[in-house]
């Protein structure tokens, strides 16, 4: 809009301007607004000052513990023209809010130009007339707050102080977010412009006060937040304002669908750009999302290409979901490229500063978002100061101040000038220490001055000397930053007191001449309501850390805590077992980050020892150390029985000992000889058993052996050939005899007579064999079926007597008999040949003779 102010939804009452210059408005949520317009006198002044006062009468409790106060200041700009001066147009103030009610004026009522119609709290209509201003003089409209505002409130004061033009100042007083936990926060933003009459653009400032409950917090600073600010352009600012306006106009159901769709696309890009996927897949998925957000392709085409790229099964509910939410998402995300870059940055790198475990009640988190000022031709510093004052706590030491300063510096997009944006976060609270005047300061220079998420907890080294000293801990960026000193709080506010107890830690490098002493540091965050506190003890050491951001490595010098655990275990016998383990927080966080989609949590759930909090190494050490003293202390034994008869053995030993003058024999010697004999026989039997098993082993069916020569089969084949040859000869001889017997020759040949006689004998022999076979068959038939042997009665009894098959199957089972290994003399000879002591003995010679 060319002139005037635009209030966000919910911050002021809706105002609707008519064509005649009248302004009609109605109160929303009991929030009255008074708008005064002041015309400008003739002269080179190009801006018309307008003063708007928005005041809240009663605190408004919100359903959620998050309160967001958005204040936008758009100064009135006009181009200077040469020529006759003329009066400016009446100022138009427009606030677009759903459900606006207008004031209907009578038809005969005409408002003079420049007057404003305002409805008061009591329902009366008031006309406000403008006041003339002197040409070239500075005009400032001051509005004092009403006394109905409560004391514990949040005040945002935004002042635009030009050098030689008008001044625009607005005070906004809003009720606290939560009545129980009220934090007085004062935010002052001051911007100075040049007197050259060139346009000055002031971007919006967003201040978010979020009380959150932190349990087991891991504080993480993104790598994108370390570096230098980039100056946004006017187009980006306009797109951002358009998206905010579109978001306020959408219904809650559509906003919920848009949020789900945005999370779906963000998770899709993160999974595609993770380390386990190929780079081509990540590029293709990002291109598809960009085309979908830019309306180059529709939801059907997007899902079809996405299924092909990810090689996944079609999802029937995805296309209706995208059709329902992608149109509104395009309105809220006018720049799809920045959305994709933010998703990729979240995947690319997280610089974990430190991780601490805290159990606290509701604690405030102040998040400030500041964008730089665009100034042409001059330097325009801009400071955003956030001060938080907490109730002092009683302690033995002097109340000191801990200052946390966040600096953000970036060059402005202007010619011949730079812009510095400084954010100062001051927390005034007592530190219970034995040495007074100790200040602990932390300075951060982020690339994007957006501090979001949970509270940032850093291991801050402190130094104590007897006098005032400061120990800054800096995370420098690639470009120099402007350091500003801490400011003093205006009013003490009623809030949740927080006590931070710090003990002296290792000293940072100090100036020469100052004594340095190594200290131990312990940080305790404590709530006065009696909640449980976990102590986090760490030995800090400085270690260089390099982070990669858009192809540029930025060194970060931070204090990384290394946790050291020393546990002593008392063992039996007054022994102490010390276990020491050191682990850096960076290593533990790398394990969590570098895992495949990070799924160490599932392994911990499946690990029974982890869930039961059992340390296996410690348990093993205790078991080994506990039982080491009992080894060998208790001896269990039984009385030995002699293998040989003691009387016969002793007599035999004495008979042999007479040759060596041995007349007496100890009982231990007899037992030893008996035991030695037993062991010798046991060894021989084991060897003989092995040899016999090898002898009976059939290697033919084994897969480890291949048959090379089979002599037995060859011999059987030759025997079979001999039998066939013999049968052939017998058959030829028989045929010859039969021919001779049938011949009827009258010659008295003796050879012929011999053949005839032999043929008759052969025939008689065959006839006798046939008769013998028939007699055997007749006798077997008369005797009946022979009785089956018990070993073979299991299966054959079924065929002979089917009626008794049920009982015979139970009684015919073979009893279990232990396998007996039979050892023959050949095995003994082979064993004696293999032993060196018996290879040349007389026993082997006698065995060979047998």
Curated annotation (Swiss-Prot):
It comes from Mus musculus. Its main location: nucleus. TFIID is composed of TATA binding protein (TBP) and a number of TBP-associated factors (TAFs). Heterodimerizes with TAF12/TFII20 via the C-terminal H2A-like histone-fold domain. This heterodimer forms a histone-like octamer with the TAF6/TAFII70-TAF9/TAFII31 heterodimer. Interacts with P65/RELA homodimers and P65/RELA-REL heterodimers. Interaction with POU2AF1, via its C-terminal activation domain, is required for octamer-dependent transcription. Interacts with ZNF628. Cell type-specific subunit of the general transcription factor TFIID that may function as a gene-selective coactivator in certain cells. TFIID is a multimeric protein complex that plays a central role in mediating promoter responses to various activators asond repressors. TAF4B is a transcriptional coactivator of the p65/RELA NF-kappa-B subunit. Involved in the activation of a subset of antiapoptotic genes including TNFAIP3. Through interaction with OCBA/POU2AF1, acts as a coactivator of B-cell-specific transcription. Plays a role in spermiogenesis and oogenesis. The gene is Taf4b. It holds the Pfam family TAFH. Belongs to the TAF4 family. This is Transcription initiation factor TFIID subunit 4B. A motif (Nuclear export signal) lies at residues 509-549. Disruption phenotype: Deficient female mice are infertile due to a granulosa cell defect preventing normal follicle formation. Deficient male are fertile when young, but subsequently exhibit an age-dependent progressive loss of germ cells and misregulation of several genes required for normal spermatogenesis. One of its GO terms (molecular function) is protein heterodimerization activity.
């Amino acid at each position: 809009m060319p002139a005037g102010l635009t209030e966000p939804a919910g911050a002021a009452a809706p105002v609707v301007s008519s064509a005649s210059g009248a302004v009609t408005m109605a109160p929303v949520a009991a929030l009255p607004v008074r708008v005064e317009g002041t015309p400008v006198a003739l002269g080179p002044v190009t801006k018309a000052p307008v003063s708007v006062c928005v005041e809240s009468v009663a605190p408004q409790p919100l359903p959620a513990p998050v309160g967001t106060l958005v204040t936008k200041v758009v100064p009135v700009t006009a181009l200077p023209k040469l020529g006759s001066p003329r009066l400016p147009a009446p100022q138009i103030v427009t606030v677009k809010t759903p459900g606006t009610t207008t004031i209907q004026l009578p038809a005969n009522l005409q408002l003079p130009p420049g007057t404003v119609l305002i409805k008061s709290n009591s329902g009366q209509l008031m006309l406000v007339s403008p006041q003339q201003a002197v040409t070239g003089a500075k005009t400032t409209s001051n509005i004092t707050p009403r006394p109905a505002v409560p004391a514990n409130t949040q005040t945002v004061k935004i002042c635009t102080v030009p050098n030689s033009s008008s001044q625009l100042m607005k005070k906004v007083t809003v009720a606290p977010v939560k009545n129980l936990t009220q934090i007085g926060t004062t935010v002052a933003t001051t911007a100075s412009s040049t007197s050259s009459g060139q346009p000055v653009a002031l971007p919006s400032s967003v201040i978010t006060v979020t009380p959150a409950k932190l349990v087991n917090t891991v504080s993480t600073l993104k790598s994108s937040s370390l570096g230098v600010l980039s100056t946004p352009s006017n187009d980006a600012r306009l797109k951002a304002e358009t998206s905010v306006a579109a978001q306020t106009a959408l219904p809650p159901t559509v906003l919920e669908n848009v949020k789900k769709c945005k999370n779906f696309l963000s998770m899709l890009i993160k999974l595609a750009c993770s380390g386990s996927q190929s780079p081509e897949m990540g590029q293709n998925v990002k291109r598809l999302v960009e085309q979908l957000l830019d309306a180059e392709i529709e939801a059907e085409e997007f899902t079809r290409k996405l299924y092909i790229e990810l090689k996944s099964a079609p999802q029937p509910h995805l296309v209706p979901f995208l059709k329902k939410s992608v149109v509104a998402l395009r309105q809220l995300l006018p720049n799809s490229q920045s959305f994709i870059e933010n998703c990729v940055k979240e995947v690319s790198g997280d610089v974990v500063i430190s991780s601490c475990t805290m159990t606290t009640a509701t604690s405030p988190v102040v998040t400030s978002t500041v964008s730089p000022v665009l100034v042409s031709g001059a330097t325009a510093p801009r400071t955003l100061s956030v001060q938080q004052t907490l109730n002092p706590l009683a302690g033995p030491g002097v109340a000191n101040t801990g200052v946390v300063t966040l600096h953000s510096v970036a060059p402005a997009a202007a010619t011949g000038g730079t812009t510095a944006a400084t954010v100062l976060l001051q927390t005034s609270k007592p530190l219970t220490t034995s040495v007074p005047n100790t200040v602990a300061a932390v300075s951060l220079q982020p690339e994007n001055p957006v501090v979001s998420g949970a509270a940032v907890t850093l291991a801050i080294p402190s130094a104590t000397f007897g006098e005032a000293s400061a120990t800054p801990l800096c995370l420098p960026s690639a470009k120099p930053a402007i350091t500003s000193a801490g400011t003093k709080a205006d009013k003490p506010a009623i809030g949740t007191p927080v006590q931070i107890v710090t003990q002296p830690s290792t000293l940072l490098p100090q100036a020469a001449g100052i004594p340095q002493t190594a200290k131990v540091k312990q940080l305790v965050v404590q709530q006065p309501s009696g909640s449980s506190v976990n102590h986090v003890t760490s030995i800090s050491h400085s270690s260089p850390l390099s982070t990669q951001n858009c192809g540029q490595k930025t060194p970060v010098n931070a204090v990384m805590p290394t946790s050291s655990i020393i546990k002593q275990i008392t063992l039996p016998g007054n022994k102490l077992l010390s276990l020491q383990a050191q682990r850096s927080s960076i290593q533990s966080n790398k394990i969590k980050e570098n895992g495949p989609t990070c799924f160490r949590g599932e392994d911990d759930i499946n690990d029974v020892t982890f869930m039961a909090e059992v340390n296996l190494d410690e348990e093993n050490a205790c078991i080994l150390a506990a039982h080491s003293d009992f080894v060998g202390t208790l001896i269990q034994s039984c009385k030995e029985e002699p293998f040989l008869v003691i009387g016969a053995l002793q007599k035999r030993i004495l008979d042999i000992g007479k040759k060596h003058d041995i007349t007496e024999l100890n009982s231990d010697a007899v037992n030893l000889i008996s035991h030695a004999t037993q062991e010798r026989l046991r060894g021989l039997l084991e060897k003989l058993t092995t040899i016999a098993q090898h002898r009976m082993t059939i290697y033919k069916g084994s897969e480890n052996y291949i048959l090379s020569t089979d002599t037995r089969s060859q011999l059987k084949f030759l025997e079979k050939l001999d039998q066939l040859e013999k049968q052939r000869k017998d058959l030829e001889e028989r045929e010859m005899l039969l021919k001779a017997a049938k011949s009827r020759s009258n010659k008295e040949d003796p050879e012929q007579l011999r053949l005839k006689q032999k043929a008759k004998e052969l025939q008689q022999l065959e006839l006798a064999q046939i008769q013998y076979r028939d007699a055997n068959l007749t006798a077997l038939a008369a005797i009946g079926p022979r009785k089956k042997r018990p070993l073979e009665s299991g299966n054959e009894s079924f065929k002979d007597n089917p009626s008794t098959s049920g009982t015979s199957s139970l009684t015919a089972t073979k009893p279990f008999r232990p396998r007996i290994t039979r050892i023959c003399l050949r095995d003994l000879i082979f064993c004696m040949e293999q032993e060196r002591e018996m290879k040349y003995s007389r026993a082997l010679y006698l065995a060979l003779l047998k």
